[in-house]
């Protein structure tokens, strides 16, 4: 019995670290990805606005069944939906004490796995999306709901399970009550830890987006990225420029490709590498997902991601911060196409 338990723990570590690598890739690319997709979404906006859509008004006898654009749809109950978040804090999770420690969700995406086909879809949620979130005072008392950036919902929790639960609720509400079965968050210190653990990565700089910050980072230069400079390389953007997350996308992509390749090489040579890597990052991770979930996600990830979408909308400059205003009509279309089946 003891042997079986130990094997289960070890197996979960293997599943966990592989999914974490996926999380890192998607989290860091998430901000840039939605901006690229934004242009396509805006081009479709006029077409979508020609049709009226009233998601809530279309509710029928069953909460799983809706009338939409003259057709009847049923929620695909073969789906399991999991929320993944990249958090902008830098310390181990167990050191968090108050809201001030929690941080914000720097990247947010939903992985939807179809259990019948063992395939996955990914829905990116722009961090600056304006939506209903629940506000709390510093002592943890709810002050009701307010429309604000979805990424700060995480900050009203404890940086642990409460923050994740709040984000889970906010995302579900944004997606018209979509069920979310689990969550996993990792703060940005995890990237530095993994970078050092694999021994750093060598990268050819893809553009000049960091040249003004560090003259060594000129386009075409070959540099070594370690835990010390990984955060700057991956996360830096000029916050004085609106929607500047797009600029850092190529850097992120180049870094993450090199990181995953290095991790794969290490794992192929060292049977204990995966377990040790998991041990190095678990202090920066919060999840309510068990061994069986990670096993299924791993299997599904090997079949590839069949679809990637972004919550449709438009990025604008708000009074103080960037804002992303969701196109509710287009989002209704997307929810139906991703999570429902026509009957």
Predicted features by range, described:
Residues 2-7, 12, 18, 30-343:
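Non-catalytic, solvent-exposed segments at the cell envelope interface
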